[in-house]
Amino acid sequence: MIQVAKIIGTGLATTGLIGAGIGIGVVFGSLIIGVSRNPSLKSQLFAYAILGFAFSEATGLFALMMAFLLLYVA
């Protein structure tokens, strides 16, 4: 019974990866729109996009880390 609860909890913890995927899509979609509107700001917008990607990916990695902790440690 405990093993089943671990697996269910791990599956629920990985749903945080959905938000990270959506966030990364929004960041790079906005980068494409911004560059198409003003190509002269490409380097500055790209730097902001990489920063947004890093923050979004970090939340996804935290969710994945929690899932692994629930599965293997708890």
UniProtKB/Swiss-Prot annotation:
Major localization class: mitochondrion
UniProt keyword terms in alphabetical order: CF(0), Hydrogen ion transport, Ion transport, Lipid-binding, Membrane, Mitochondrion, Mitochondrion inner membrane, Transmembrane, Transmembrane helix, Transport
Chain positions of site Reversibly protonated during proton transport: 57
Pfam families with a match to the protein in the record: ATP-synt_C
Residues that span the membrane, as ranges: 16-36, 50-70
Protein family according to the UniProt entry: Belongs to the ATPase C chain family.
Entry protein name: ATP synthase subunit 9, mitochondrial
Originating gene: atp-9
